[in-house]
A protein has these predicted regions:
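Hydrophobic alpha-helical and helix-loop surface patches within well-folded domains
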Residues: 1-188
Length: 190
């Protein structure tokens, strides 16, 4: 799948690994989640079972990704998604180019909704297959299809390694919940 996705869109994997490795990894994770449900003996299910034996607790794919992110962020070694391949540390290339981007794509899909996000990706693919798209091209395609400004994702979230910090407060008197961004990328709080 990784070779097909890269070959069909022909994005520059060296300058923008997230446009190849990360986006495809998002779809791969969706597929693997469905495969695990339909086949408990799958390779990823066996890996989860082995990790559970070693760690003494169950680790689903999200928990494993969170653990790897924690390792990448330890001592401030995290890097932005929008980093050239040669500038990643060897550990971060795998964690960030593949996994962190997949997580970010999941965030974008949740924000847009599955139907609209899928339509955006189909239109991007049809418009840019075999044409060597750049980051501005995928952003333009998604914005044109969704009729939304997605700078918060393509220009802010992908270009920073600042963690998102949100403060949630609730008041019992007027039964209000307040959600406030304290730090990090200017992502929607919907």
């Amino acid at each position: 799948g990784h070779i097909w996705f890269y070959g069909a869109l022909a994005s520059n994997e060296w300058d923008y690994p997230w446009m190849d490795e990360g986006i495809y990894s998002y779809y791969e994770q969706l597929y693997m989640a469905k495969a695990r449900k339909s086949d408990p003996a799958s390779q990823s299910s066996r890996l989860s079972n082995q990790l559970e034996k070693i760690l003494g607790q169950s680790l689903n794919e999200d928990s494993l990704m969170n653990l790897l992110f924690d390792v990448a962020c330890f001592d401030h070694n995290d890097q932005p998604i929008h980093t050239k391949s040669e500038e990643f540390t060897s550990f971060n290339y795998g964690v960030i180019a593949y996994m962190k981007t997949a997580r970010a794509m999941g965030f974008l899909y949740d924000y847009l909704g599955e139907e609209l996000a899928t339509k955006c990706m189909h239109n991007y693919y049809n418009e840019w297959k075999f044409r060597h798209p750049q980051p501005a091209d995928i952003q333009s395609s998604f914005e044109k299809t969704s009729s939304m400004d997605l700078d918060w994702f393509f220009k802010d979230l992908l270009s920073t390694n600042n963690p998102l910090r949100i403060c949630i407060t609730a008041t019992e008197i007027d039964k209000q919940i307040k959600i406030e961004r304290k730090k990090g990328p200017k992502t929607p709080l919907e």
